[in-house]
Structure formats: structure tokens, C-alpha cells
């Protein structure tokens, strides 16, 4: 018996809602941009992978920014892989950009983290590029209005967070503001999580100081406002990932809003990551749900955390193997002023999941 046209249409619409295809993080494919591409003419913008029309237009009008944004894309991949290296989902699928699997195409907890991290990373990289003088359109951040304490003075070159936030959000949010970019629920989710990433970035701005004085006495400290490293921001976002709230798209009055699924008596908090679709346990390989599985992943036999062999291997057990490690040893300090070391080799036992 052939399925009815109505059934096929309903199935198609259901698939669209489940995948929630959105182009918001496809720009991470810029990480693959060849270094030989000079990016000094506006026609080069069309050659860049993963950009939507509005991002191509931003590229043409802000050509000097693009090398910095390419660097941000590389930082997102490196930082995400490092942050989740000890978990079943290890962010490996981010390297498939712009052709993601369902772990990042759907409105999952994992996509929530990547959207937040990518929004933070692009603003972070631009803010730092202003400080180092790599961008002609910006310079150091403003001197804070508050008076520093005794023995302190404002100086140095602050990270230009304000410029980073303005230009970063223009670029990273552009795909979600297109009319044809997935379901409304997914767009709202991605915009919310991107803003959470920028909030964590703003909260990371801290006072950094350098000592001045006779014989290193540090009688005066020159201080400026600087951002924490992206890896620290990613760790804060990972904690939000672990406590993320599942939401539903529910009518309230004449409009629909995202509200917590299990506690919809309160609105979504501005500081929490949110997701629409539950994730698999990532134990077994299943590309239909975007899971690479944990077979052959390295695990820690003595750990009680997420990298433990019990958790990482999902109860399947693990295999030991011997690995040779070369490290520096027998180091000697020579006056003045250098250190020489020998190279020593030792064998260590490691474990991989069955």
C-alpha cells in the first residue's frame, strides 16, 4: 500500500523540524581556507566556503577582517576538540564543516555549545586583533572610567571588546536572521546560545597588570582590561553545556516562545544554554544521529571522571597496549643562563575502548 501524499508531506515537515537545518555555524569551514588565498580583493569573498549571502556582503565591506575571522574559525575547532577530549562526544564532527552530521545540524545540546563558543571566539579574536594592531579599523580598548587603587595606574593596551562584539555578532548572527534558515524554533535557540557565549566572553574581561620599579620592586603597576584565554571561556561554556535546559517552542499570546520543557512556569534564563532535541549517548557509531561512537577511543583506567574506561567505553570493556614516550630528562642548569637536557624513553600502558 502506497503512503498517501498527506502522510509524505507530514513526514517531510517532521524531518525538517527534527533537523532544524540552520547555516549559523557553517562559516567554521573558513578554517580550511588555503593560506595562498590573499583575500585582498572583494571577488575573493565568493571563494570562501560556508558563507551565506549576507556574510559574503559583510566580507566585501570589511575585507580587512576576514583573516581574523578565518583565525577565529580555526580557534573554534581547536578549542572545542580540546575542551571535549575527555568525553564521549569529543567534538570531532566539527571538522566536517560545512557538512555537519545531525549532532550539530539539529537543535542539540552539542550544537548549543558550538554556537556559543563560535560567537565568543569570533568576538574574542577580533578584540585581540585590535590590540595587536592587526586591524586598521580599530585600536586599543578604552581606558576604564573607575580609578585604580593606590600603586596602580591605567596603561598598556586593553582588548577592544566593544568592537569585537559589534563586528563579531554582525558576522556570526547573520545566518540566523535570514528568512530561509531553518525553523523559527532553531533560529531562536541559536541566537539565544550565541548571546550566552558573548555574555561569558564579557564576564571574562579582567584587570591585568605589569610591574615597574627599581630592581623589580613593583612599586607601580600598569594595568589594563584584558580578556581571558578562549580555553577558559570554553570551560565556562562546558559547565553550561552540562547543565543546559531542554526547551519547547510554545504559543504564548499571539507569538511563540522557547520555554523550559519540564518547568515551563518560568522563562528561559538569559545565562543558560538551551536545546530542543535530546542527544544519543554517543556510545555506538550511528551517523543517522551524528554519533561517531567510542570504539578505539583512549580512556583512563584510574579516573572517576568522564574519561574513565567505565564511562568512555559504555561498559563494553577496554584493551591495553604499550606505548613508548620520549621526554626530556637529566636536565642541567648552566651559568648563565641556559638549560640542557637529555632525551629519555619509557614505556607506559594505555587503554582503548573495545
UniProtKB/Swiss-Prot annotation:
Sugar-bearing residue positions: 40, 90, 300, 304
Entry's localization field: Secreted, Extracellular space, Extracellular matrix
Post-translational modifications reported in the UniProt record: Palmitoleoylation is required for efficient binding to frizzled receptors. Depalmitoleoylation leads to Wnt signaling pathway inhibition.
Signal sequence, start to end: 1-24
Molecular function in Gene Ontology: cytokine activity; frizzled binding
Protein biosynthesis is among the record's keywords: no
Keywords: Developmental protein, Disulfide bond, Extracellular matrix, Glycoprotein, Lipoprotein, Secreted, Signal, Wnt signaling pathway
A GO CC annotation given for this chain: cytoplasm
Cysteine pairs bridged by disulfides in the record: 80-91, 130-138, 140-157, 209-223, 211-218, 283-314, 299-309, 313-353, 329-344, 331-341, 336-337
Family designation: Belongs to the Wnt family.
Designated name of the protein: Protein Wnt-11
Protein species of origin: Coturnix japonica (Japanese quail)
Amino acid at each position: 500500500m502506497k503512503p498517501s501524499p498527506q502522510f509524505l508531506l507530514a513526514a517531510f515537515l517532521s524531518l525538517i523540524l527534527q533537523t532544524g537545518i540552520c547555516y549559523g555555524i557553517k562559516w567554521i569551514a573558513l578554517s580550511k581556507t588555503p593560506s595562498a588565498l590573499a583575500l585582498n580583493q572583494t571577488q575573493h569573498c565568493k571563494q570562501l566556503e560556508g558563507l551565506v549571502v549576507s556574510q559574503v556582503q559583510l566580507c566585501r565591506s570589511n575585507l580587512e577582517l576576514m583573516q581574523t575571522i578565518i583565525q577565529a574559525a580555526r580557534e573554534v575547532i581547536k578549542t572545542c576538540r580540546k575542551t571535549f577530549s575527555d568525553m564521549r562526544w569529543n567534538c570531532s564532527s566539527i571538522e566536517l564543516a560545512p557538512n555537519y552530521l545531525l549532532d550539530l545540524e539539529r537543535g542539540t545540546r552539542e550544537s548549543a555549545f558550538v554556537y556559543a563558543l563560535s560567537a565568543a571566539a569570533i568576538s574574542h579574536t577580533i578584540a585581540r586583533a585590535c590590540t595587536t594592531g592587526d586591524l586598521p579599523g580599530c585600536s586599543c580598548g578604552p581606558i576604564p572610567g573607575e580609578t585604580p587603587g593606590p600603586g596602580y595606574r591605567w596603561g598598556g593596551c586593553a582588548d577592544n571588546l566593544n568592537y569585537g562584539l559589534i563586528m563579531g555578532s554582525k558576522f556570526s548572527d547573520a545566518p540566523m536572521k535570514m528568512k530561509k534558515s531553518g525553523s523559527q524554533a532553531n533560529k531562536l535557540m541559536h541566537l539565544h546560545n550565541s548571546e550566552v557565549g558573548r555574555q561569558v566572553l564579557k564576564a571574562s574581561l579582567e584587570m591585568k597588570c605589569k610591574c615597574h620599579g627599581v630592581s623589580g620592586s613593583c612599586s607601580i603597576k600598569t594595568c589594563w582590561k584584558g580578556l581571558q584565554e578562549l580555553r577558559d571561556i570554553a570551560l565556562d561554556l562546558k559547565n553550561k553545556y552540562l547543565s543546559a535546559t531542554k526547551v519547547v517552542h510554545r504559543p504564548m499570546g499571539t507569538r511563540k516562545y522557547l520555554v523550559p520543557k519540564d518547568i515551563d512556569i518560568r522563562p528561559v534564563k538569559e545565562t543558560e544554554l538551551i536545546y530542543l532535541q535530546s542527544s544519543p549517548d554517543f556510545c555506538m557509531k550511528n551517523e543517522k544521529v551524528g554519533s561517531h561512537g567510542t570504539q578505539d577511543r583512549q580512556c583512563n583506567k584510574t579516573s572517576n571522571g568522564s574519561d574513565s574506561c567505565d564511562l568512555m567505553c559504555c561498559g563494553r570493556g577496554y584493551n591495553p597496549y604499550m606505548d613508548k614516550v620520549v621526554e626530556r630528562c637529566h636536565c642541567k642548569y648552566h651559568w648563565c643562563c641556559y638549560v640542557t637536557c637529555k632525551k629519555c624513553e619509557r614505556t607506559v600502558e594505555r587503554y582503548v575502548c573495545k
